[in-house]
């Protein structure tokens, strides 16, 4: 688990980390203001792309391979972001924020790698294996966006959080407030110098079973560990089908057949994997 520290931009390149922090501050000033984003990240993402005059499609559905968290690609002038809804909600949120950084680079820094080859986010990159600089930057951007310094200070005061003897339950409280994964919460506390490196390493050595047990016992951050199988979205497909229905643009038999097929697909995806 300590690879999270070793592979963090904060440890690898402090100067670049500060630059990313400035980017997040600028982004929030325009697209988010003072809100704690949580699961509104999907709306923030959509708003950002559409305000740059590019059609946007958000795809959220369960994929059997939970190692694949998200991907982004551009086809025929339209941007697609797919988020795997078979992973915990906090990880979906972080994945969306991670992908937002790649999109940010495309629009603000004219980095056209996204157009050429797209972006694929695997679970290990979020957890502890971010080896490429851009992935380290994207992880830093995501964590800073979801748990910005000012809001972290504010909420620490609201909940009277003390960081002198930080426990796993204190980290769970940060997770609950900001909807971030455990490792990201620990890293943010370390980055803001709420905890030292020794404490960070100790917290990161806590096993996943123990973390899950404490979430279950306390109820803290439990809502963000859920896998909401009812959330299935195929971009603007449903809206376009509705428009066709209103305009009578296709034969009724064809439309009913397509609607039945879509319903069948959705119901199949909502069934728990065996």
Question: Predicted segment positions?
Answer:
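Active-site hotspot residues in diverse enzymes, especially metal/ion-binding acidic/histidine motifs
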Residues: 1-274
């Amino acid at each position: 688990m300590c690879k999270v520290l070793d592979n963090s931009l904060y440890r690898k390149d402090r100067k670049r980390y500060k630059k990313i922090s400035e980017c997040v501050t600028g982004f929030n000033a325009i697209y988010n203001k003072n809100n704690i984003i949580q699961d509104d990240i999907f709306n923030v993402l959509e708003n950002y792309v559409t305000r740059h005059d590019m059609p946007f499609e958000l795809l959220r559905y369960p994929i059997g391979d939970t190692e694949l968290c998200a991907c982004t690609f551009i086809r025929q002038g339209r941007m697609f972001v797919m988020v795997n809804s078979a992973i915990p909600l906090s990880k979906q949120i972080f994945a969306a924020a991670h992908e937002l950084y790649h999109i940010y680079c495309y629009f603000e820094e004219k980095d056209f790698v996204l157009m050429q080859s797209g972006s694929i986010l695997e679970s290990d990159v979020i957890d502890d294996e971010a080896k490429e600089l851009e992935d380290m930057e994207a992880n830093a951007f995501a964590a800073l966006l979801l748990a910005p310094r000012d809001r972290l200070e504010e909420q620490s005061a609201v909940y009277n959080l003390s960081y002198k003897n930080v426990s796993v339950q204190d980290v769970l409280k940060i997770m609950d407030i900001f909807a971030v994964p455990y490792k990201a919460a620990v890293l943010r506390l370390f980055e803001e110098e709420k905890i030292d490196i020794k404490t960070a390493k100790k917290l990161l050595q806590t096993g996943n079973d123990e973390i899950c047990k404490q979430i279950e016992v306390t109820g803290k951050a439990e809502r963000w560990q859920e896998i909401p199988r009812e959330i299935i979205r195929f971009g603007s497909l449903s809206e376009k089908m509705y428009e066709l229905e209103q305009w009578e643009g296709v034969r009724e038999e064809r439309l009913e057949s397509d609607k039945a097929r879509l319903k069948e697909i959705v119901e199949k995806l909502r069934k728990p994997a065996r």
